[in-house]
Amino acid sequence: MQELVMPSMIRLANRFHFLFSATRRVDFLAPLLLRLFLAPVMIAAGWQKAGNFDATAAWFGNDDWGLGLPFPALLATLAIATELVGGILLLVGLATRYVAVPLMITMLVAAFSVHWQNGWFAVAPSDPETSMARPLAALGIPAAQRSLENSAEVGQRLQAARGLLREHGHYSWLTERGNFVVLNNGIEFAATYFIMLLVLFFYGAGRWLSVDYWIERRFHSFTAGK
């Protein structure tokens, strides 16, 4: 029996391996989609900072309500250049691995200097039963337990706010475009963008639909012809 089952399982595994290997023909789609997702995010962030440069520089340098960083005008300029130029380069797939480095640094600075004290979530969960922190709290992680307690309080505040709006406001109109949430402003987005940029740093912009690919291809054909 075993002599019949094992060869069949091996043949089945080989077929699946062949099918998965065939998908490598379109492996350029993954880095392409990462670039198309990240590029407008970075360009929009840089554009917003550039359009409000004085306010951005003031926020970088102010100790009371800002980041309290030295040389705020210089740092604001560097942040704007990194996001604007980096976003454009990501879009066309030029110098992708190089530009991923300053963009990752920007995400780390944002995560640790702006969002870290607010925890993980960008939008605060309002139901402890469905929070992704619940399994971690079950493992005895204190931060996860505090997150669940915060979720319960967020839920109470949202319920109170919705009650006031139903009683005194046009609730259906106010929520027509989406429900009210509590913005937590945690590191979730910065960490997610960092991970996506890290993938591009290691794997590059991808084949066919990136300038990097055609430069590399031209370079190899040039060196091979020598």
For every predicted segment, state its role.
Residues 57-71:
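Perimembrane loop-to-helix junctions flanking transmembrane segments
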Residues 2-55, 70-81, 85, 92-226:
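Extended, low-polarity transmembrane helix blocks
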